[in-house]
């Protein structure tokens, strides 16, 4: 089954981007490259069970097995040793990436309390967009009764756009609800 968002990108979004920014070829039009989900679990240093729960939740949200991230350096103030497991991340590409973005835009973000749109200022100057989610409960896969702790996660949307303006246009046309 072809992905709804991918089809929308190919049939509507890409042609309108080519027209708006006057690209010389179809391949020059910006597209989504990957989406990285990251959950930092700082308290995993004291209680490793917290990390297992975060990994399981991230797996449910993304539909693939997360990679456990480890500390690069020891920091005494945080009681952290080099090599300790302190978080989990997932990199989505291809069909799963489009599925996740579709779900994020149409299901999860509207479930955020007092949601007025995502920030317009979270671009990094290279055409990538970063978004923080305060609680994992906005995702339909997470069962409220099984959650013992509210955790947030970072979502980074990496595009091939050369500028923030192009990336903003790409995401807006894919349905990202930017704040007015």
Curated annotation (Swiss-Prot):
Function: This is one of the proteins that bind and probably mediate the attachment of the 5S RNA into the large ribosomal subunit, where it forms part of the central protuberance. In the 70S ribosome it contacts protein S13 of the 30S subunit (bridge B1b), connecting the 2 subunits; this bridge is implicated in subunit movement. Contacts the P site tRNA; the 5S rRNA and some of its associated proteins might help stabilize positioning of ribosome-bound tRNAs.
Pfam families for the chain: Ribosomal_L5, Ribosomal_L5_C
UniProt xrefs under Gene3D superfamilies: 3.30.1440.10
GO molecular function, one term: tRNA binding
UniProt keyword annotation of tRNA-binding present: yes
The organism of origin for this protein: Limosilactobacillus fermentum (strain NBRC 3956 / LMG 18251)
InterPro entries (UniProt xref): Ribosomal_uL5, Ribosomal_uL5_bac-type, Ribosomal_uL5_C, Ribosomal_uL5_CS, Ribosomal_uL5_dom_sf, Ribosomal_uL5_N
Subunit structure: Part of the 50S ribosomal subunit; part of the 5S rRNA/L5/L18/L25 subcomplex. Contacts the 5S rRNA and the P site tRNA. Forms a bridge to the 30S subunit in the 70S ribosome.
Keywords of the record: Ribonucleoprotein, Ribosomal protein, RNA-binding, rRNA-binding, tRNA-binding
PANTHER family named in the record: 60S RIBOSOMAL PROTEIN L11-RELATED
Protein name: Large ribosomal subunit protein uL5
NCBIfam families documented for this protein: PRK00010.1
Gene it is expressed from: rplE
Gene Ontology annotations of biological process type: translation
Domain of life: Bacteria
Keyword Nucleotide-binding part of the UniProt annotation: no
Family per similarity comment: Belongs to the universal ribosomal protein uL5 family.
GO cellular component, one term: ribosome
């Amino acid at each position: 089954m072809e992905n709804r968002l991918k089809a929308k990108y190919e049939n509507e979004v890409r042609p309108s981007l080519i027209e708006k920014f006057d690209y010389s070829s179809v391949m020059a039009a910006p597209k989504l490259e990957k989406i990285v989900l990251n959950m930092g679990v700082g308290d995993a240093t004291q209680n490793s069970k917290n990390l297992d729960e975060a990994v399981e939740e991230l797996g449910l949200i993304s539909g693939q097995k997360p990679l456990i991230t480890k500390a690069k350096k020891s920091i005494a103030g945080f009681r952290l040793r080099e090599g300790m497991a302190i978080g989990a991340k997932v990199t989505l590409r291809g069909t799963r990436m489009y599925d996740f973005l579709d779900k994020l835009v149409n299901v999860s973000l509207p479930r955020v309390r007092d949601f007025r749109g995502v920030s317009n200022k979270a671009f990094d100057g290279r055409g990538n967009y970063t978004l923080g989610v305060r609680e994992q409960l906005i995702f339909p896969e997470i069962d409220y009764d099984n959650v013992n702790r509210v955790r947030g996660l970072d979502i980074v949307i990496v595009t091939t756009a050369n500028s923030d303006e192009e990336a903003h246009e790409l995401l807006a046309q894919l349905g990202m609800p930017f704040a007015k």
